Amino acid sequence: NFEAAGSAVTYDSTSFCPDSASTATSLSTGYKTYSGTINMDETKRIEYETITEQVKEQLGYKVGIITTVNLNHATPAAFYAKVASRNEYYNIGLQMIESGFDYFAGGGMLQPDGADGNQENIYDLAEEAGYKVIQTQAEAARLTAEDGKAIIIGQHLADSDALSYDFDRAANEWSLADYVEKGIEVLDNETGFFMMVEGGKIDWACHANDAGST
């Protein structure tokens, strides 16, 4: 029942076989870049404006980011961060908090204490910035719009702190659809909202030649 649909060509500046960072940059900004780079040009000095920034700042929309993989992985990161390398996980996490976006849900953060484990914890910083950090399904189920900005980390994490493959998911374990449904519930408002939803583990399964899990 959507009023419009769109498509994008996602080859990047140098490759017809690009990675998630450059392809997600194409989707979130409309611009090409090198593989491994998120929302910056080929010189890695000029930053691109994202669609999420535009709808938040110009239209007053609420914004939600949902994925089955880590919240600071390349695809979700391309809708709130700008980094020269997709491997800057801690920096990406900081930019997630700084975005002020309203709803994040998915797998756990990669390197939440920094690459060397000596930085202030990302989840603690998020709470200091006014986010409600949720790590149980029961608490996620109780979340309402009145709770304000929220970050939901899946309770039942699997490989690399991502959500389980749907193939392996327990009957009482939330699916991607459940996190989307909760997102719609808390983001819904008269002005409107933007939601980026990624089934990221489909990609992981294909990399592993695991047809069953796709």
What role is predicted for each listed range?
Residues 85, 89, 172-180, 213:
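Phosphate/oxyanion-binding active-site loops and adjacent basic polyanion-contact surfaces
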Residues 44-48, 52, 56-63, 70-72, ...:
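Well-ordered, non-transmembrane segments within structured domains
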Residues 66, 106, 154, 196-198:
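A cross-family glycoside hydrolase active-site/sugar-binding cleft signature
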Residues 1-115, 120-149:
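N-terminal catalytic scaffold of extracellular/periplasmic and nuclease hydrolases
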Residues 99-102, 110, 148-150, 154-171:
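Formylglycine-dependent
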Residues 134-136, 140-152, 179-200:
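Active-site regions of oxyanion-processing enzymes, predominantly non-cytosolic
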Residues 74-80, 157-170, 183, 188-192, ...:
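Active-site His/acidic residue clusters
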